[in-house]
Regions:
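A composition-driven surface/loop motif
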Residues: 1-131
Length: 131
């Protein structure tokens, strides 16, 4: 699993944190997955910071190093949410209509815009739900 994949999963799990009406199974799996993927996010932030602080490199070289590192293996196992827990997520999220998500953020935006729940659920399922 690459850092990019782990970061996407971590972000989706964090977005699910805004949903307060999860049933116990979904909440339990969300918490455990969050703990798992947070490790890669923390490691990534430290690595990115170290690369950014390199004084002898140009911004172009730093950006290339960051992009290269993002595609490297982060050392985490591929952990996913069960279908049963995902069904509970769907039940909790559907009434919201939309959810703030990094999936729709452009480089010019500072905040995650709202996207339709169906779009968010599909991305969540593709990244985090057992097949």
């Amino acid at each position: 699993m690459t850092y990019n994949e782990a970061l996407v999963r971590n972000a989706l799990i964090n977005e699910l944190g805004a949903v307060t009406n999860l049933k116990p199974k979904a909440m339990t799996e969300k918490i455990l997955l969050g703990i798992h993927y947070r490790k890669a996010a923390e490691d990534w932030l430290k690595t990115r910071e170290a690369i950014s602080k390199e004084e002898n490199a140009t911004d172009e070289v730093k950006n290339e190093a960051i992009q290269t590192k993002a595609t490297e293996d982060c050392g985490l196992a591929d952990k996913r949410m069960s279908r049963e827990a995902f069904e509970q997520v769907v039940e909790a999220v559907l009434p919201l209509g939309s959810i703030a998500s990094f999936l729709a953020v452009s480089e010019a935006e500072n905040e995650a815009p709202e996207i339709p729940v169906a779009m968010w659920l599909q991305a969540f399922a593709e990244a985090l739900v057992e097949e």
